[in-house]
Design a protein with these regions (language model features):
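Short, internal strand/loop/helix patches
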Residues: 81-109
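A short, hydrophobic beta-strand/beta-hairpin element that forms part of a small beta-sheet core
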Residues: 100, 111-126
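Gly/Pro-rich loop segments of beta-rich domains
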Residues: 152-173, 199-224, 254-277, 305-329, ...
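Thiol-/selenol-based redox modules, centered on thioredoxin-like
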Residues: 123-173
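Short active-site neighborhood of thiol/selenol oxidoreductases, capturing the structured segment around
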Residues: 22-44
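N-terminal "domain-start" segment that seeds a small globular fold
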Residues: 1-24
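Structural microenvironment flanking redox-active thiols in thiol-disulfide oxidoreductases
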Residues: 39, 44-86
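Conserved beta-strand positions in repeat-built beta-propeller and related beta-rich domains
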Residues: 184-188, 237-241, 288-292, 342-346, ...
Length: 467
């Protein structure tokens, strides 16, 4: 027998809303109520699923999400602003900083989605990010059994502070440096930029629409692109929100899809394309950090085949060979000869994959729930939600965008230490780093900015992209 959902606690924070959402606001039509974490790839998949269902059913369906902090850094309500902008969410989000609502509703893991009927009664509880088709069928049945009601105002998104910032850049992430050019994933604006080293925009790839479309530079569309790799006249894009790998022909500007369909996670051969993030290109393969599937994959550029390199798919930090290893939401990659370095974001870890035998070794990190801000030998060093890495071209160093600690740090390869790198200004959840043209380029994601750290004199300057 369906029971009424409890009232929402007053201890929730609703950024940008004049007043808190109440359960009464979700009555009158079926509703989706999500419990998740902003850093969780599976939560983000459910948010996209909810948006698709709201567009499909219009006024006959409504939604809200209660977001709890997995990491200390996620206690900042501004994380919800980023979440709403990157996903173009049309419904309100609340921060459950002390997990009060989670306890109130008996939530045990993220994401958990409650399906409520028009009377506010819980009809179904779905744990995890399962197939969209299954969720769509359940929602369709719930909508079909609901009698027509007079038009009513649905709970709106979190207001202007929850919308895409009106700035030249919006939550930039991935970077790659070419000959005389810098390529940048302007993630919140759903586009890729080609710039000169002074920040002048030379070309834009993608219309900026939150969509999925191949075509010319101005017609193509992306959803939250978060990975880039350059190979001669081709720029590869990890189109995260579309679960797709895309290719930009730098001669014509045309955008095509290598694999994925823009709808959701898709099985392709022996691998699943599920929220691809980090990319690295070799002469023959495109390596992919598959954040939603906790695996490292390789796309054969000649055969057009996607294969798993390492990872069982389980959310964990386990070393081993190939499928016996486990990752925790990998988001960034760096490649040197036959070693692929992996930024394992949710595991707060840095890993190495030795491509000759697919052996995985943890360089920094102790487990998915062991994080902090500690420099020193690898055995004691701690990171918090690192999002990107880059290899120094001159020294055996790995640069790390330690997003959860708002800092830049280095790992000296070959058994060295983790060291925080002092900068004259604070970073804001940096989500991208790249080396090139005698500089380290930093995507200061939360500040909507691109920074350049000069490799010769150590000066840091703001790069005025599009300004």
């Amino acid at each position: 027998m369906a029971t009424s959902a409890p009232e929402l606690t007053d201890r929730l924070t609703w950024p940008g809303r004049p007043e808190a959402l109440r359960m009464a606001d979700l009555r009158g039509a079926p509703a989706l109520l999500l419990f998740g974490c902003a850093s969780s790839a599976w939560t983000r998949q459910r948010l996209d699923d909810m948006s698709r269902l709201l567009r499909r059913h219009g006024d006959k369906l409504q939604a809200a999400a209660l977001i709890a902090p997995r990491f200390d850094a996620e206690r900042d309500p501004r994380n919800l602003q980023q979440l709403q902008a990157e996903h173009a969410l049309p419904f309100p989000l609340a921060l459950d900083a002390d997990w009060v609502a989670w306890q109130q509703f008996g939530i045990e893991s993220w994401p958990t989605l409650l399906l409520l009927d028009a009377q506010g009664r819980e009809r179904k509880r779905i744990v995890g990010a399962g197939p969209m088709a299954e969720l769509a069928e359940l929602v369709q049945a719930l909508v079909a059994e609901t009698p027509e009601v007079p038009a009513r105002k649905k709970p709106a998104a979190n207001g202007k502070r929850g919308l895409m910032p009106e700035l030249p850049l919006s939550y930039p992430t991935a970077l790659v440096v070419g000959t005389g050019k810098l390529y940048l994933a302007d993630t919140g604006h759903h586009r890729i930029l080609e710039c000169d080293f002074n920040g002048r925009i030379v070309r834009q790839f993608g219309s900026g629409a939150y969509d999925y479309m191949d075509g010319g530079a101005g017609d193509a569309a992306f959803r939250r692109p978060q990975g880039l790799a350059l190979q001669r006249e081709a720029l590869f894009v990890a189109d995260t929100g579309n679960h797709a790998l895309r290719r930009i022909d730098l001669l014509s500007g045309d955008v095509t899809t290598l694999c994925g369909n823009g709808e959701g996670p898709t099985q392709i051969g022996t691998a699943t394309i599920d929220q691809p993030c980090g990319l690295q290109a070799s002469a023959s393969h495109l390596y992919v950090a598959m954040a939603g599937d906790n695996r490292i994959c390789a796309y054969d550029l000649s055969r057009g085949a996607l294969e798993t390199v390492a990872g069982s798919g389980f959310f964990a930090i386990n070393d081993g060979n190939g499928m016996f290893a486990a990752f925790a939401q990998p988001t960034g990659l760096a490649l040197r000869q036959d070693v692929l370095y992996v930024c394992d974001a949710a595991g707060s870890a840095i890993r190495a994959v030795y491509l000759r035998d697919q052996r995985v070794q943890t360089l920094v990190g102790q487990g998915p729930y062991d994080f902090g801000n500690i420099d020193g030998p690898r055995s004691i060093a701690r990171l918090q939600w690192p999002r990107a890495i880059a290899l120094d071209p001159h020294d055996p160093l790995l640069w790390i965008a330690d997003a959860g600690n708002d800092r830049l740090c280095t790992l000296r390869l070959g058994g060295g230490v983790v060291s925080g790198f002092s900068l004259p200004q604070r970073l804001h959840s940096p989500g991208g780093v790249a080396c090139g043209n005698d500089a380290l380029w930093i995507a200061d994601t939360g500040a909507h900015a691109l920074l350049r750290l000069d490799g010769r004199d150590g000066t840091l300057r703001h790069v005025p992209v599009g300004e």
